[in-house]
Every structure is written in structure tokens, then in C-alpha cells.
């Protein structure tokens, strides 16, 4: 919320590696915490070319998801191809209620629910994530 406000650009300039570390760690599940090296790598990616000073500009998606809700919902409800979801049920960002909303739009949508994963399943459990991608591609007839 702070990033969306008039002090957003100031807040992004004041963000420290310590603050980032705390926030980033909080979106991983307790069972699969991010490593110190993972935090350091992601901080390095964020600060490259002063990317850490753009946070207030990147949160525009929060407003856009309201403005373009019909378009985004239509992309789910009208999709003609194979569509599947994998969801980390401990994700504090994309809460289970978000998944429930997607399932209201597309009730027959196959979902893999990972009770022990958070916001970044691909980092928390790469083999399981890769297996889900392989399974999804095989089910859709896509070449592996």
C-alpha cells in the first residue's frame, strides 16, 4: 500500500537488503524456507541497474487488476486450450481465496494443490514443480 501512495518512490529508495530479506522470506513456506544464498541472489537481481528503485512503478498491476478484471476473467473463462494450475496453499500473496475465485470462473480447472508450499513453488521444491510441469505438458499433448 505504501508503494502505491505519494511516498512510494521514497519508500523504494529506502528499502534495505535487511528489509527485503525479511519480506522475501515471509512468502516462503515454513517447510521450504529460502536459503541465505537465495535471498542474496534475489537481492542482487533486484538492485541490478537500480531495479530496486522501480517498485512504486511496478505495483500498478494492483490497480490494473481492478480496471481490467473483465478482460482477465475472460482470459480464464474463454480459454480454449488446456489450462491447469499449481498452487502453493501457504502462499500469503495469492491466497487460497484467489484460487477459489479462479475456480468460480472455470470450475473444471485441474488444480494441483501443494499444502506445504508458498509463493514460489519452483524455488521451494524444484523437482516437484518440474514434475507438475512435465505432467501438465504430457496431459495436454505438448512435446516435452
Can you annotate each of these PLM segments?
Residues 1-106, 110-113, 134, 139-141:
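Flexible "cap/lid" subdomain of the alpha/beta-hydrolase fold that forms the substrate-access gate
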Residues 114-130:
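Catalytic histidine-centered segment of alpha/beta-hydrolase-like enzymes
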Residues 144:
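A conserved nucleotide-sugar
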Amino acid at each position: 500500500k505504501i508503494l502505491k501512495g505519494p511516498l512510494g518512490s521514497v519508500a523504494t529508495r529506502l528499502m534495505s537488503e535487511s528489509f527485503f530479506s525479511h519480506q522475501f522470506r515471509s512468502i516462503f513456506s515454513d517447510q521450504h524456507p529460502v536459503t541465505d544464498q537465495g535471498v542474496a541472489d534475489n537481492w542482487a537481481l533486484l538492485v541490478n541497474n537500480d531495479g530496486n528503485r522501480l517498485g512504486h512503478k511496478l505495483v500498478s498491476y494492483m490497480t490494473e487488476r481492478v480496471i481490467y478484471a473483465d478482460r482477465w476473467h475472460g482470459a480464464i473463462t474463454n480459454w480454449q486450450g488446456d489450462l491447469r494450475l499449481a498452487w502453493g496453499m501457504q502462499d500469503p500473496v495469492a491466497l487460497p481465496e484467489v484460487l477459489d475465485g479462479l475456480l468460480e470462473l472455470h470450475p473444471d480447472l485441474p488444480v494441483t494443490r501443494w499444502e506445504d508450499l508458498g509463493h514460489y513453488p519452483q524455488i521451494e521444491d524444484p523437482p516437484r514443480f518440474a514434475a507438475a510441469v512435465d505432467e501438465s505438458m504430457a496431459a495436454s499433448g505438448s512435446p516435452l
